[in-house]
Swiss-Prot record:
It comes from the Eukaryota. Keywords: Aminopeptidase, Cytoplasm, Hydrolase, Metal-binding, Protease. It is found in: Cytoplasm. Belongs to the peptidase M24A family. Methionine aminopeptidase eukaryotic type 2 subfamily. Binds 2 divalent metal cations per subunit. Has a high-affinity and a low affinity metal-binding site. The true nature of the physiological cofactor is under debate. The enzyme is active with cobalt, zinc, manganese or divalent iron ions. Most likely, methionine aminopeptidases function as mononuclear Fe(2+)-metalloproteases under physiological conditions, and the catalytically relevant metal-binding site has been assigned to the histidine-containing high-affinity site. This is Methionine aminopeptidase 2-1. GO terms for molecular function: aminopeptidase activity; initiator methionyl aminopeptidase activity; metal ion binding; metalloaminopeptidase activity; metalloexopeptidase activity.
Amino acid sequence: MTVDAPELLEKLRITDAGANGADMSSSTSAAANGTGKEVDDGSDDDGTENPPAVAAEHSTAKKKKNKKRKPKKKQPKVQTDPPSIPLSQLFPNNSYPKGEEVEYKDENRYRTTSEEKRHLDNLNSDFLSDYRQAAEAHRQVRQWAQRNIKPGQTLLEIANGIEESARCLVGHDGLTEGDSLIAGMGFPTGLNIDNIVAHYSPNAGCKTVLAQNNVLKVDIGIHVGGRIVDSAFTMAFDPMYDNLLAAVKDATNTGVREAGIDVRVGELGGYIQEAMESYECEIRGKTYPIKAIRNLCGHTILPYSIHGTKNVPFVKSNDMTKMEEGDVFAIETFGSTGSGRYVEGGEVSHYALRGDADRKDLTLSSARSLLTAIKKNFSTIPFCRRYLDRIGQEKYLLGLNYLVKSGIVEDYPPLNEKPGTYTAQFEHTILLRPTVKEVISRGDDY
């Protein structure tokens, strides 16, 4: 719509030199240029023909109008402590930080400059954006956890703090049906002390308190759109455990460094074992060789499924399976001052719906309703009892055990080394992109 500002101004001067005319001339002039500012009518008139009262009233109107304008709310630029601002506000263009990019070696070196491979890489923009958002959430949450986890805290306090922040950063609290499938926890936060190797997360009512002489493994999974970032670290508060942690960190970094397209996983396990078992650790005057836990493996990650079909052993093996373009691997290692083997046992906290389960008729009504809730809120993403509590499930244990016995839900008991031993874990998620290997979870901390 076009407005002839000079003509309007002339009419206003003729009909009314009062406040209404001045106010209307201001507003219509602003409308004419679309900016909210007055326009020049092209005359040599300096405005002296307008009575002073009109000019004063016009000025007052402008001031009043300006007072009504509320300044735009600025987006926060700095994360809070603990982290609570969604990453979408810190990275408004969804341009999340890349992980560590590493060029392939030897016969795959050409991939870095191949136009064909670059094109394939560009087709994965949504995939990479989801993974990088989950990875940035992981870095911010875990670095806060590393600064704040202290002896004297309960495992429940630690787990709830980590998970609350993770959900805030991805912008989905998981309290409405299906919300946690958009983004949220990739699996229950593992808080495994001393000889407990993996798969322990505190259930409601857990009273365990972290002690000064404990070795704590913190395993966190965060997903966006089903793209799970799986990364873990170990904390100890007594320097006598330093060599144990150093051995496992070195082994994980070795696995990350040697992994790549066409690498055979059995050979990769040999590199990991060699790095791990070159260390020993003196604890209370006794020296222990660090052993790789040989009946555990790293693994591929699939959408909405933390364990894929390929494994990466921690020891040399004859497994000729090759890593391939497009694979996503969790390269993790566990070291121990004990036998180097785990056994299952203890109170179960981790569960997951089996993707291949036969959906047989369930005679127990509580099992049927629980299964519906699991499907709608978690699908095949692992969950724990605390997560069922959060979505309002009550008196579900009988139904949950029934689903486990029916083979529809898998339970994952804690994995334990011998009592009195100590274990450590470090883990990264890597993407075998067409052009480069991206260590998506890499951070300044590890």
